[in-house]
Amino acid sequence: APFLADTRVRFLEIPPEQARRGKGHVLNAGYTAVTRSELAEPNPENVVVVVFDADTRVEPHFLRAVAPYFRDPTVAGVQSAVRMYNADQKLLTLWQHLEFAVWGQVFCKAKDRLGSMTLGGNGQCVRFSALSSLGDEPWQTSSLTEDLDLSLRLLSKGWRLRFCSSVAVWQEAVPRLGALVRQRSRWLQGHVICWQHLPALLRSRLPVFARLELLLFLLLPIVFLPIGLTSIANWLHVLFSLFVGDWNYWNYDGDWDYWNTVSLLTWYVLGFGMAPLVVVAWQQIDRPPLWRLLLHSHFFVLYSFVWFAASARVYLQVLLGRHAWFKTSRREREGAGAGGVKTKRAAAALRRRRHVDQEPIQ
């Protein structure tokens, strides 16, 4: 690769038998290499480790955007926003783009304010001294979600984590439904494994609302399935009412009254509760046409069934005692690599950000 010709770049090669042991092993190998070099001397608190996936496209001003957060010595890490550069490939990849838009623009901003922000696996920036406070191998190799595990241990030790919404990393959305469900079930199972950190989190000095949010966040695997079953029952009831002619669902007797309105609003919240959040988040990052915004924000409800299926798979995996790790395949066809996939959305977003000063950070 051309960038390897830069004298500032150091290439670390890991034997295949070690690289296939999981992302945590690879990250720890990189951490060890930095520890043994002069890079972390003499001020490790001023050294920041940045983690990108292999298929990531990084916006030019990434470092300039995240660096100011580290002026606060209590900040251990910063997470950037995440976008999908193949969102235009199919409906499934667009929904993942919307999913990460809502996660970043709504939930991560809220978590940042509460003090319960957690790091992701891509676009993750961590202070070297914070990693050192976790021991010789900061990333847990036994965890299915090493990023979440790292975040919870840092928060338990009193470190702060922040979210930077002004810059994003662009990654490839998973184009196949089966691979996507497997990936999401691995994430949820990783949440279950991270329950081991709950006692330390609840005893920590984190704000009360931060601890409560983290508790609810970690319990997501067990609530997705009941919520999914409730949602399915709600939709079946509505469809039965519409096609069979049983309008009792709306309590409709010829005159529209207060309770008819309550029934309609209840159905909308249960069926399309995420739609307003999608509208807000998508409008902020892409500004799509109004018709597309309203249409896809409501069709996005179908994407929730990916999480319901993933939750059911986690129940099964836990009952069977399985904790296997599988690398998620994002390739739908040979040759559709990260460098070969270009979309109007990713290109337009990168063009909008070209005006940012790109001088190196000292």
Describe the residue ranges of each PLM region:
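Short acidic donor-binding/metal-coordinating loop in glycosyltransferase active sites
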Residues: N46, A54, E146
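Short aromatic/hydrophobic "clamp" motif used to bind/position activated sugar donors
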Residues: V49
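Catalytic core of nucleotide-sugar-dependent glycosyltransferases
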Residues: E99-Q105, V181-L201, G271-V278, R313-Y315
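Catalytic donor-sugar/metal-binding loop of nucleotide-sugar-dependent glycosyltransferases
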Residues: S151-V169
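Active-site donor/metal-binding and catalytic loop motifs
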Residues: S165-A179
